[in-house]
């Protein structure tokens, strides 16, 4: 037959053959977590979990050596100063570019105010409750401010997870607010909750300002400025407002050191996460700090954890699971190994 002749078996240039299908990609090449998912996972594992240890460790240092919040804040700021070596090695200015130096310092000031309010609150209210109020206020304020200033909305699943996490915080906090003691103790407790709320507000503002900064080495610059601004503001007050106090035993020194390291890790991870995902979602995922703080409050500080705390923690974890699962999207790389 003519079709069997080699001549007729040559490829026809007038009818190009369909493109060959690309070779099958491996799973890790076909799918990879999106940027938002990476940010949320970093916020969960590197931001929320280490931060959950900060409050109980600070409470232990206060109980062991009567270490005030001002000294705790100064010790934490000291851990930020070695970042100057990294900036020097990279040849970057320590205070950031001159045109946005003021905003970088303002962001650092907001971070210091947030941390200071958190340390003051944790000394008069349970660590879990202080973390609950701070994270709840930061989540709500981040959602409102981002929607108003950046016009960046959320999807249905995100709102469901966000509102669910806030509901969990209300379940944790509600019974405690109804049983506030009267008199001086009740006033100090109320002020502690107010400080925790203001700390969350300052945190949300700091995250929004940080998102607006775009220059190389933004994260290490803001981290160094936070330590510098904190020291410049706290060291004079250390000698004016009170008598300086140092940790009196090895346990207190260990708590201060561990708290400073874990806080720096959490600060760095949150700074990375907020550039990848919505600030409100990052703050919602950081509610894992509350769950960790409640666990440590029971096992380390031997403070009572009510049934409402356990129920609220379960709601928070479920909401975090919804947010994380919604953002666990797979993106095709579109690249084929040669």
From Swiss-Prot:
Residues 1-27 are annotated as: Disordered. The chain crosses the membrane at residues 37-57, 67-87, 102-122, 160-180, 190-210, 221-241, 250-270, 281-301, 305-325. The keyword Membrane applies. It holds the Pfam family EamA. The keyword Repeat applies. Expressed in placenta and testis. Keywords: Membrane, Repeat, Transmembrane, Transmembrane helix. Residues 49-174, 272-325 form the EamA domain. One of its GO terms (cellular component) is membrane. It is a multi-pass membrane protein. It is found in: Membrane. Belongs to the SLC35G solute transporter family. The gene encoding this protein appears to have arisen by SVA-mediated retrotransposition of the SLC35G6 gene in the primate lineage. This is Solute carrier family 35 member G5. It comes from Homo sapiens.
